């Protein structure tokens, strides 16, 4: 994974690998905060993302793809529109690392430019490919970003670091219904423009 390319070889990524008690503590504390926000939405302001992962205002075709993905997953799991309890429980699976024994948190130094997010993304993809080569499964998760202030002291993340995302690492339960869901993909013609 460390062979991922980066602009002028800056290699701006950091990765924290958690398991055992630190992983369990993160799960407990973030799930408690997630539940508290649900009970009192005003608390959400205390858990702001370090950067805008998603746009403030969604436009087509991105909102359409997001909805298709959500409807497909929730439909498979039997979660109906408006079932806030089931939606909350499903979202909270993120903060339980989807039952994986290992969690990873990826960061970059805040002084770096936005290009370092691209570099870190290539590093993250390499981690995922390397994991599959070893018969492991991964799930990259932006859901952790809003809870960096809980996670940072547990993992020893520096104040000058920006959390990019988290990731669950383990062996997928192939018998779980959720693992039969495959996210739809647009055709190559929809995102490729041949010039010349």
Predicted regions and their residues:
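Acidic, surface-exposed loops and disordered segments
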Residues: 2-196
């Amino acid at each position: 994974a460390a062979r991922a390319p980066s602009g002028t070889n800056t290699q701006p990524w950091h990765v924290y690998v958690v398991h055992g008690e630190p992983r369990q503590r993160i799960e407990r504390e973030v799930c408690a905060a997630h539940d508290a926000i649900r009970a009192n939405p005003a608390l959400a302001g205390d858990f702001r993302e370090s950067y805008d992962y998603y746009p403030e205002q969604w436009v087509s075709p991105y909102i359409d793809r997001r909805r298709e993905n959500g409807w497909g997953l929730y439909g498979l799991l039997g979660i109906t529109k408006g079932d806030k309890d089931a939606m909350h429980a499903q979202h909270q699976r993120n903060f339980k690392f989807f039952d994986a024994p290992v969690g990873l948190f990826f960061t970059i130094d805040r002084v770096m430019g936005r290009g370092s997010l691209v570099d870190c993304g290539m590093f993250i993809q390499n981690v995922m490919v390397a994991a599959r080569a070893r018969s492991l499964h991964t799930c990259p998760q932006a859901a952790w970003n809003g809870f960096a202030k809980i996670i940072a002291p547990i993992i020893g993340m520096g104040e000058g670091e920006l959390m990019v995302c988290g990731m669950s690492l383990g062996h997928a339960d192939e018998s779980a219904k959720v693992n039969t869901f495959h996210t739809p993909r647009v055709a190559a013609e929809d995102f490729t423009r041949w010039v010349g």
